[in-house]
A protein has these predicted regions:
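C-terminal, loop-rich substrate-recognition/catalytic regions characterized by aromatic stacking residues
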Residues: 1-284
């Protein structure tokens, strides 16, 4: 997608008095909520997980927003909440507290918060990524000691989102997220032994609370398009080598500035390739 429909929320200040924290335990069996308890959940995901991530900084063009997350969810470790009986509005940053153990000195943890519709489609609400070597200090990162317990609080991106009644909230955890994260030099397995998700729940209604003023823009430039704009976003799989790649192409087409006659044309190709068998062959 290139955009999502939404509404405006108006707050007198932040933090808002209409936002309250709600904690959901990560429970055995993959439940999000419930009584929680001790876990022994291994997390080790394939290097090519993440092709549905979209652009890191989307501008609203050419399907730059994250797509259906169901495929990436299937390759992740997921905790899923009960079917919502009423809409749930989120405003702010969700926080994920975990106790983790790594079997390697270098590892990542990635968390995606998703809205799962009754038909199974999954929309990414927010995500967070952490190089666990930075978990104690970003200024002085240090290698992990395999087997040691690591207490982590991962703050996800700020979000403003409303889940509909009948949908579910899903937390998807992974150790990889290509191409947002470069692969670790060797696959790490994390063991999750305890966790809780803290949600910023907003108490506002469904109606828009603010109407923005009409946008102001410069006069449209005087031009003629000689050939159309084309955009391509595809995933390639080499069935011989096993390599997978995200390919993004943007062809501007030929455009003439009618004020002075300059004709321009631009072509852009991006390729993000990863080898599931060898992280050192990652290419971008």
């Amino acid at each position: 997608p290139s955009a999502r429909a939404g509404r405006w929320v108006a707050e007198a200040g932040l933090p808002s008095a209409r936002v309250r924290d709600a904690g959901l335990a990560l429970s055995p069996g993959g439940a999000l909520g419930g009584e929680g308890g001790a876990l022994a959940q291994a997390i080790c995901t394939p290097p090519d997980l993440g092709f549905a991530a979209g652009e890191f900084f989307p501008m609203g063009m050419n399907a730059e927003m994250p797509g259906d997350q169901a495929g990436d969810d299937a390759a992740s470790v997921c905790f899923e909440g009960a079917v919502l009986e009423a809409p749930l509005s989120l405003l702010g940053a969700a926080r994920l507290r975990m106790t983790l153990h790594s079997d390697k000195p270098l590892a990542f943890i990635v968390a995606r918060l998703c809205d799962v519709a009754p038909d199974g489609t999954s929309v990414r609400i927010a995500h967070g990524m952490l190089n666990l070597c930075h978990s104690k200090s970003r200024e002085k990162p240090s290698r992990l000691t395999p087997g040691d317990a690591l207490e982590v609080e991962l703050v996800l991106d700020e979000c403003a989102y409303r889940l509909a009644a009948g949908h579910r909230l899903r937390l998807a955890l992974s150790t990889t997220y290509w191409p947002f994260l470069w692969p670790s030099p060797e696959p790490a397995t994390l063991t999750l032994t305890q966790g809780a998700l803290i949600l910023p729940c907003h108490e506002g209604g469904a109606a828009s609370e603010w109407t923005p003023p009409p946008p102001r823009a410069a006069k449209e430039w005087n031009h003629h398009r000689h050939s159309p704009h084309r955009a391509i976003r595809r995933v390639e799989t080499d069935l011989i080598s096993g390599k997978r790649a995200l390919v993004v192409e943007d062809h501007s087409g030929r455009v003439e500035n009618l004020d002075h006659g300059l004709i321009t044309e631009e072509d852009m190709v991006e390729r993000f390739e990863v080898d599931p068998k060898d992280p050192f062959l990652a290419y971008a």
